[in-house]
Amino acid sequence: MRVLSARFRVLLACLALVIPVSETNFLSKERASQVLVRKRRANTLFEETMKGNLERECIEELCNKEEAREVFENNPETDYFYPKYLGCLGAFRVGSFHAARQSANAYPDLRSCVKAISDQCDPIPCNEDGYLACQDGQAAFTCFCKPGWQGDRCQYDVNECKDPSNVNGGCSQICDNTPGSYHCSCKRGFAMLPNKKDCKDLDECALKPSVCGTAVCKNIPGDFECECPDGYRYDPSSKSCKDVDECSENMCAQLCVNFPGGYSCYCDGKKGFKLAQDQKSCEGIPVCLSLDLDKNYELLYLAEQFAGVVLYLKFRLPDITRFSAEFDFRTYDSEGIILYAESLDHSNWLLIALRDGKIEVQFKNEFSTQITTGGNVINNGIWNMVSVEELDDSVSIKIAKEAVMNINKLGSLFKPTDGFLDTKIYFAGLPRKVESALIKPINPRLDGCIRGWNLMKQGALGAKEIIEGKQNKHCFLNVEKGSYYPGSGIAQFSIDYNNVTNAEGWQMNVTLNIRPSTGTGVMLALVSGGTVPFALSLVDSRSGTSQDIVVFVENSVVARLEAVSLCSDQQSQLKCNVNRNGLELWTPLRKDVIYSKDLQRQLAVLDKAMKRTVATYLGGIPDISFSATPVNAFYSGCMEVNINGVQLDLDEAISKHKDIRAHSCPSVRKIQKNF
């Protein structure tokens, strides 16, 4: 019983708590039914003919959803409004429960709560960054955009940089679009002007004078460049100009020589190449004048060897035989040995030579020595029949079968031994070193030809077979007076250019008479060690039909005569006078010599070389680097040289290529016309 009594008391306490709460949350029966009852409105006479009004319909009075529809006149807005409207009613008409007020956004009164429901601008439907204002409308809203924005909600940025009415936003260089605006900027190397639209170039060279170091600073729009002379490249790390090694880039066809600021291409002229007009590739040196180089194996050339005997024959004949030699002889040379004969023991000898253009005979036997020079001058370039015959008591010399000399003698020229006459005959030279044994010294070298020889009355026995198969022992058929350079060798002279009577110290006056057969080659050069301090050369002109006469000091051109027609059947004269103070180049064909602007400095280089030992070369340069001078091809053609008033005789040279003809030059080949 006590237990039940306790439980009853607890139940009564719970009911006591529930009853007040229920009274708070639930309306009375009368009040609750009022929501569903439409009160009588004012103006009921015209109510159905007037458009709904939110204030009148739903604030001053309570409205149902149909009446709310009359206010908004569209379903979407009505559907949006009415649930929120009921929330406001629950907050402000029914009671003041705190949670209900929170759900109505804590509006101060019912009117504010209901008014806010239909405001299309609350919450703001516009883009917060782009809108300026929002205007509420019935079932609509209008967003007013800030400058630089567009769209119904101001959600799109206006790209002023692409406005066709204001190209590039009015910026002179870069237009940068930003949300709702834009701004102008400048490229690197430019600065913005106060108008914020135009850019001005910055002169980096003036702002930073040392920006290029030792190079030259050049301002350009928006930037600067560090310039170097041709042949140099700017090195940013050292801020200096470094030489460009063009040769590492295979610029030249044959030899490339790099030097500070440039490079030069060279071709091996000694192999018949010259530098082409592009100054990089090589091409063959063409013949500009054809010479008659035809030879005859029956003509023995006496100057095949610069030093030494051309042909050696030995005869062993009966002791009754006497010496005799008969031959046709042609030369323009004035001095030299035709033949030398001797006994086996060298005790007796006979020399037949030419001195001053006349026949000279020297001999020695066991009884006497004799020398005789006489007769007509026969170095006239035509064939002359010469005979030397030993008689009983004399030696007879005939030219064209006419006796010109008769030399008395005692005994035989050569003494027989054991019933035989042994005789050795040498053509165009002396055996061993017997010059000292001669009665009168003579230059043995002789540029001449013999044919139809009959020695010791044995005809051409032995000699014909020797020379027949050797081209270098054959003579040209047609020659003229002059010196011939075949384009394959040089001649060297030792010349003293110092002039003690001249205040200039040294002088070189050169006169050349030339008839070139190729348009490129070195005519005269001075060589000192591995350098060429002076060279007088021919170079084919750019036209291809004429030649340039060029003077070089080492690798520099100091004088040039352009476009001279030298490849003709007539010889041309050329003069070059030079000393330490000046240079003069002259030819009657042209007067307009081009001299280097740096002539005096280049002459100083030559002057320094002339104070040392220099060797003079004709027809080319020796075997030194063919980069020592721009032209290294051998000269080809006829040429006679006079230096300081002395006519150079190639027979007097220190050395001479065997194919150089000292006193004869092939004639110009005649072109036969077909009729």
Swiss-Prot record:
Name the source's superkingdom. Eukaryota
| Region listing for Thrombin-sensitive, in residue ranges | 88-116
Name-wise, this protein is Vitamin K-dependent protein S
Q: Which GO terms describe its biological process?
A: blood coagulation; fibrinolysis; positive regulation of phosphatidylinositol 3-kinase/protein kinase B signal transduction
PROSITE patterns according to UniProt: ASX_HYDROXYL, EGF_1, EGF_2, EGF_3, EGF_CA, GLA_1, GLA_2, LAM_G_DOMAIN
- Domain annotation Gla: ranges: 42-87
The gene designation is: Pros1
Modified positions ((3R)-3-hydroxyaspartate) in chain numbering:
D136
